[in-house]
Regions:
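Ubiquitin-like/PB1-type beta-grasp interaction modules and other compact soluble beta-rich domains
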Residues: 1-68
Length: 69
């Protein structure tokens, strides 16, 4: 069984071990403007995404702006 994390409340296999790599799989470019990320309830500044390691059981929240009315 693959290790799991929670991403925006949904279980997901932990296929990569850095925050930046996971965000890339979600279409978030490194250092993307307007994107907020919290890992286990703590905001992670974009400059720390490459060095932030993910572990089984982590809870990740990704907030992105969207257009609409």
């Amino acid at each position: 069984m693959n290790p799991q994390i929670q991403v925006n409340g949904q279980p997901e296999s932990l296929a990569t071990f850095t925050l930046e790599a996971l965000l890339r799989t979600k279409g978030v470019a490194p250092g993307a403007k307007g994107v907020a990320v919290a890992l286990n309830g703590q905001v992670v500044p974009a400059g720390r995404w490459p060095e932030t390691r993910l572990s089984p059981g982590d809870e990740l929240e990704i907030v992105r702006p969207f257009s609409g009315g």
